Amino acid sequence: LGKLLDVYESRLLDVYESRVLDIYESRLGKVLDIYESR
């Protein structure tokens, strides 16, 4: 059971991290677009 939990936790972390990175990158991209259009 412990190993299964470890695998599940690491999967969850991977998904969470990639989602946070996606959101962060899209926000950063929008900010850069606004900054460059000036």
Curated annotation (Swiss-Prot):
It comes from the Eukaryota. The keyword Lipid metabolism does not apply. It catalyses: RX + glutathione = an S-substituted glutathione + a halide anion + H(+). One of its GO terms (molecular function) is glutathione transferase activity. Keywords: Transferase. Its EC number is 2.5.1.18. It is an enzyme of class 2 (transferase). Conjugation of reduced glutathione to a wide number of exogenous and endogenous hydrophobic electrophiles. In plants, may have a detoxification role against certain herbicides. Belongs to the GST superfamily. Phi family. This is Glutathione S-transferase 2. It comes from Populus euphratica (Euphrates poplar).
